[in-house]
Amino acid sequence: MAPERGYTASKDDLLRRLARVEGQVRGVTRMVEEDRYCIDVMTQITAIQAALDKIALGLLDGHARHCLLGEGEGPSEPDEQVRELMGAVGRMLSR
């Protein structure tokens, strides 16, 4: 049996959101193939980035609730837990 993760309870929703993003990326590919207007393509890319940001924030929330406050896997020392979490936040913000 797979270990329980912070997103386990919302896994179906997470998979739906990821499938939607996947469809959006395919749509942008078609737009480029069809030589669509640059601003329209960039608008769709911005929407994809926003959707991914929302997914990532949900994962961070689940991680904080499950792995930091609960009994999830990861570092056992609070300082290491915070360092790990802040590293993930930093990677999100540095793109």
PLM-predicted stretches and their roles:
Residues M1-R95:
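Solvent-exposed interaction patches of small proteins and small membrane subunits
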